[in-house]
Swiss-Prot record:
Pfam families: AdoMet_Synthase. The gene is mat. This is S-adenosylmethionine synthase. HAMAP family: S_AdoMet_synth2. ATP binds at G141, Q142, G143, S144, V145, D146. It comes from Methanococcus maripaludis (strain C7 / ATCC BAA-1331). Pathway: Amino-acid biosynthesis; S-adenosyl-L-methionine biosynthesis; S-adenosyl-L-methionine from L-methionine: step 1/1. The lineage of its organism: Archaea, Methanobacteriati, Methanobacteriota, Methanomada group, Methanococci. Belongs to the AdoMet synthase 2 family.
Length: 405
């Protein structure tokens, strides 16, 4: 049995606090572009390693950097002047010794990484010309010998932690968190893009709740080739605002909602107009891990890990596995009848099996009429079950079925 501790969460339930702030950086934000590219490269390497070697080999591709380009957007359609530059860096296993033949097997790491990055950009940024608007440069190197040894040790058994680190998670999402998350998903959905193609992918949603009032301040790039006049631009904002307000009704739960889009505009001389749908074309830079946490949100009123989740190897990198696992456990514990809120923290020790954390801390707020002592055994059972089946988390990640940002 793992060292699992359950205790009462000594705080006011989040929805009853006077103030809450929640943020999400959309998929076209420069930081999120880096997160998405890094994770796509990792997933592609996992699949390549399994195809070539039968197992996922050591890699960490969480060092993607984006250097903003330069564009000249204008009503009716502008142009890129200098391309966006994306650097893929990190470490990966590029050569493997075949013990039977004694030969060195070289693995197509750089080709796999560049192709994965470009495929992701094509999917995420529909108005970007991959041949002209972006340069993808791969400088991924060979992994550290010591860390590779930890990664490979007893491969047929449970992986060992690559570091002494921790992961955190919480559930359920608050009303504000749900609205912020679902608003960005709506604005970047295929359905909305088909209806309002001028809406770009660079969207940031900042949610503020004061009592029972929620204010969404949304930065939303517009794509210039779909906007022929300032009146068109204003209409795009109005249509998007109406869609956001309608969608939010499903989650408001009695809250008042105010939606503000592109508040820096004067709708004549200063508007958020882009060629590609992202501010990365206008000198805005990006890095992995500088935006959304593993649950897709930035939540300063909740515990958060500063670890970047995207791009880390899904076998034994605690910064990835324990952050994702913490959220999964929190979601399952929150489904127990009588649990109002749940927070999870999991701490590893380097070199120890990832199924044996130094501690797995569960904090809960019981609903009225329920006692912590009655809820504790069920919560521990859920946590232990996930530790015993931790490789399922890895399988979900490798298959691309887990969101890391």
């Amino acid at each position: 049995m793992a060292n699992i501790v359950v205790k009462r969460l000594e705080r006011t339930p989040i929805d009853e606090t006077p103030v809450e702030i929640v943020e999400r950086k959309g998929i076209g934000h420069p930081d999120s572009i880096c997160d998405g590219v890094a994770e796509s490269v990792s997933v592609a390497l996992c699949k390549m390693y399994k195809e070539k070697m039968g197992v996922v080999l050591h890699h960490n591709t969480d060092q993607v950097e984006l250097v903003g380009g330069y564009a000249y957007p204008e009503l009716g359609g502008g142009c890129m002047v200098s391309p966006i530059y994306i650097l893929l860096s990190g470490r990966a296993t590029m050569e493997v010794l075949d013990k039977e033949s004694g030969k060195i097997i070289k693995l197509p790491v750089n080709t796999t990484a560049v192709n994965a990055a470009r495929d992701y950009l094509k999917k995420a940024l529909r108005n970007m010309d991959l041949e002209k608007d972006v340069v993808v440069d791969c400088r991924i190197g060979q992994g550290s010998v010591d860390l590779v040894e930890v990664f490979d040790r007893k491969r047929s058994e449970i992986p060992h932690a690559n570091d002494t680190s921790f992961g955190v998670g919480h559930a359920p999402l608050s009303t504000t968190e749900k609205i912020v998350l679902e608003t960005e998903k709506l604005l970047n959905s295929d359905a909305l893009k088909a209806e309002i193609p001028a809406v770009g992918e660079d969207i940031k949603v900042m949610g503020l709740r004061e009592g029972k009032k929620i204010t969404l301040t949304i930065a939303m790039a517009a794509v210039d080739k779909y906007v022929n006049s300032c009146a068109d631009y204003v209409k795009v904002k109005e249509l998007a605002k109406a869609k956001v307000e309608e969608n939010a009704k499903k989650y408001l739960d009695g809250h008042e909602l105010e939606v503000c889009i592109n508040t820096a505009d004067d709708d004549e001389d200063c508007i958020f107009l882009t060629v590609t749908g992202t501010s990365a074309e206008m000198g805005d830079d990006g890095s992995v891990g500088r935006g959304n946490r593993a649950n897709g949100l930035i939540t300063p009123f909740r515990p958060m890990s500063m670890e970047a989740t995207s791009g880390k190897n899904p076998i034994n990198h605690i910064g990835k596995i324990y952050n994702i696992l913490s959220n999964i456990i929190a979601e399952d514990v929150a489904k127990i009848e009588g649990v109002r809120e749940c927070q999870i923290r999991i701490l590893s020790q380097i070199g120890k099996p990832i199924t044996e954390p130094k501690i797995l801390d569960i904090e809960m707020i019981p609903e009225n009429g329920f006692e912590l002592e009655d809820l504790s055994p069920k919560a521990k059972e859920i946590a232990q079950k996930w530790l015993d089946n931790i490789t399922e988390v890895t399988e979900r990640i490798v298959s691309g079925n887990v969101t890391t940002f």
